[in-house]
């Protein structure tokens, strides 16, 4: 996995690309301007920055420039989760879950899903 970190705005732009790529600049403006208020020039600058980070590729087809993600959503999500976990909880998954459970942020379905995840993780660890 790569080490590309995304800002909140870059996440919005990348989500649009992950769902719709390849896209022209005009298509991205249409997808993002109502929710963000971003102008064409703002989105263009963000695309250039994401390209220089290695997150977006720019392909020219005639006069059109098409933008596509170079990183997978799953990889970016893992990187963001690791960063958040380290920054906020000192890397402790247990502390994070305890905090969420203490705030009653977990539904019964969440708890059942966590049990299944932990059971599966326990099985994988015992196989090693």
Regions found by a protein language model. Give the residues of each.
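Short, cationic-aromatic polyanion-contact patches
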Residues: 3-9, 61-80
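Pre-recognition alpha-helix immediately N-terminal to the DNA-recognition helix
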Residues: 11-15, 27, 95
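Short acidic, hydrophobic short linear motifs in intrinsically disordered regions
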Residues: 23-31
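Short helix-coil junctions and helix-kink-helix linkers
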Residues: 30-38
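Short, hydrophobic-biased segments on the C-terminal half of alpha helices
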Residues: 47-48
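Glycine-centered, phosphate/nucleic-acid-interacting loop/turn motifs that mediate DNA/RNA or nucleotide
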Residues: 54
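Conserved segment of winged-helix/HTH DNA-binding domains
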Residues: 71-97
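C-terminal regulatory/oligomerization modules of transcriptional regulators
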Residues: 79, 102-128
